[in-house]
Amino acid sequence: MKLDEFTIGQVFKTKSLKVSKDDIMRFAGEFDPQYMHVDEEKASKGRFNGIIASGIQTLAISFKLWIEEGFYGDDIIAGTEMNHMTFIKPVYPDDELFTIVEVLDKQPKRNELGILTVLLSTYNQKEVKVFEGELSVLIKR
């Protein structure tokens, strides 16, 4: 979709994605190797009583779920900004996540381009919000 096809206040819901313990440990091993993500024994004695997903992974999953819906298609040029990211609740192995996306703003620019800002709100299978953040992209008008 082009910038002008989006409406402020428009809401989309993505499909869901189940996050396995192996997914969590593989991602964290490469990108966020803190004990609560990679060390089951130590994590079991910690605040969350077990392995949890990295917030960076939760952000990446949220973005993936939105992008896979295909609304940007070939009209997206580039991401421009991420703001107000909040990791609200932990994501545990076997949680199933989905994202609600709300169009917050659209700013036409020159050269047939514009900036689209959306709010990504990600929930688990119990409909508990685990992540929220704003994403802005440069997109064709």
UniProtKB/Swiss-Prot annotation:
Residues 8-112 form the MaoC-like domain. Gene3D superfamilies: Hotdog Thioesterase. SUPFAM superfamilies: Thioesterase/thiol ester dehydrase-isomerase. It comes from the Bacteria. Pfam families: MaoC_dehydratas. This is Uncharacterized protein YdeM. It comes from Bacillus subtilis (strain 168). The gene is ydeM.
